[in-house]
Curated annotation (Swiss-Prot):
Coiled coil: none annotated. This is Probable Fe(2+)-trafficking protein. GO terms for biological process: cellular response to oxidative stress. GO terms for molecular function: iron ion binding. PANTHER family: FE(2+)-TRAFFICKING PROTEIN-RELATED. Belongs to the Fe(2+)-trafficking protein family. It holds the Pfam family Iron_traffic. SUPFAM superfamilies: YggX-like. InterPro entries: Fe_traffick_prot_YggX (IPR007457), Fe_traffick_prot_YggX_sf (IPR036766). The keyword Cytoplasm does not apply. GO terms for cellular component: cytosol.
Length: 90
């Protein structure tokens, strides 16, 4: 049977993650209260942040920035918008 959580981001019952996606206490909090759907949305946003801000993930500061943004995205006031991103028009 699939594990379900009340997703803190989507504010609905949804399929839970299979394992903590990040180490430490933050990963545990995400595992317990974030759905697969919300995690997938974060991964897309994280990719935009990395690309638009030209982050080097070998740099400790870039990884700390992304961890802070991830915490804000799920448990705070929301992550930064990707600078320079223009949504596609139809």
């Amino acid at each position: 049977m699939t594990r379900m959580v009340h997703c803190i981001k989507l504010d609905k019952e949804a399929e839970a993650l299979d394992f903590p996606p990040y180490p430490g206490e933050l990963g545990k909090r995400i595992y317990e209260s974030v759905s697969k759907e919300a995690w997938a949305a974060w991964l897309k946003h994280q990719t935009m942040l990395v690309n638009e801000n030209r982050l080097n993930l070998a740099d400790v500061r870039a990884r700390k920035y992304l961890a802070t943004q991830m915490e804000k995205h799920f448990f705070g006031e929301g992550a930064d918008a990707a600078q320079g991103y223009v949504p596609p028009t139809e």
